[in-house]
Amino acid sequence: MKDCEYQQISPGAAPPPASPGARRPGPAAPPAPSPGPAPGAPRWSGSGSGSGSLGRRPRRKWEVFPGRNRFYCGGRLMLAGHGGVFALTLLLILSTTILFFVFDCPYLARTLTLAIPIIAAILFFFVMSCLLQTSFTDPGILPRATICEAAALEKQIDNTGSSTYRPPPRTREVMINGQTVKLKYCFTCKMFRPPRTSHCSVCDNCVERFDHHCPWVGNCVGRRNYRFFYAFILSLSFLTAFIFACVVTHLTLLSQGSNFLSALKKTPASVLELVICFFSIWSILGLSGFHTYLVASNLTTNEDIKGSWSSKRGGEASVNPYSHKSIITNCCAVLCGPLPPSLIDRRGFVQSDTALPSPIRSDDPACGAKPDASMVGGHP
């Protein structure tokens, strides 16, 4: 077999002469199309540095949020995972108010005064505004520990020699206004909870100044939306009492010259309003009074139920370190002042190194920093 000789041809050189017996080549065939990516394979877009990146659109942080919340309008609005009870709240408020404006307000405006529908409209819009702000506002969720911070805990678990070992619950103690306060470690969020912070089992988030999880508003009630929640229940009690009184007045005026049953037959919708308001007003008024006491004492529902600063659990009563010893000052501290910013960057983009929740490796060079003493020690 003859050795093949390869000769580099310059671009401007003429082609070599063909042998007499050789066949003249036909037109060159078009190049075969390059095979596309397999179905389901990621599409890569090249960059100037030579390192490819995923061609799909970048994800925002609300799309990979670890809690059980639902986000709307591109992450601008958030709600708890379950919204059935919240929908029932909207249905009761809207249906009762619409029936009142359709069947009672025209008669009362003609007979008594035009101020009745105006007052009802102002109360209704204020109630709906406070409800929507309570439901769609971040209650004060604290972001979870980063991968590197969580890797310190995983490394501590690996050093024990057992894959099923979990260190016991750890606490830290801090002094607040001369009172010792214990900070518990959250194994879900991988951090020590700040004072008055608790982990909501429904939303699966640590919420700052956690009051309670309210299914009626479809959200947790915490530091960033408690003022809206208090304004909602207070204004709702006024609206319910106002509609109840107006419906009773309407039926009383209709029953003049006839019996009360005849008045009920004339406006059956008013009967439905009367029943809804009668069974709702007691719980709403009681809830408003209870939270008025909490605001005046600078307490939360969680602290009151647990008896953190009282002798409800049989222990010694201690002084509330968050109280300012004045009702007016406590009310201003809870309800007034600037709204703290949200600590979760819902609209931010997921970074490439933290986009996927891959298994945590304690030997990752990016996590080579020594863990903080607060992460591995029981006390500071």
Swiss-Prot record:
InterPro entries: Palmitoyltrfase_DHHC, PFA4/ZDH16/20/ERF2-like
PROSITE patterns: DHHC
Organism: Mus musculus
Membrane-spanning segments: 83-103, 112-132, 228-248, 270-290
Protein name: Palmitoyltransferase ZDHHC18
Keywords recorded for this protein, A-Z: Acyltransferase, Golgi apparatus, Immunity, Innate immunity, Lipoprotein, Membrane, Palmitate, Phosphoprotein, Transferase, Transmembrane, Transmembrane helix
Gene that encodes it: Zdhhc18
Function: Palmitoyltransferase that catalyzes the addition of palmitate onto various protein substrates, such as CGAS, HRAS and LCK. Palmitoylates HRAS and LCK. Acts as a negative regulator of the cGAS-STING pathway be mediating palmitoylation and inactivation of CGAS. May also have a palmitoyltransferase activity toward the beta-2 adrenergic receptor/ADRB2 and therefore regulate G protein-coupled receptor signaling.
GO molecular function terms listed in the Swiss-Prot or TrEMBL record: palmitoyltransferase activity; protein-cysteine S-palmitoyltransferase activity
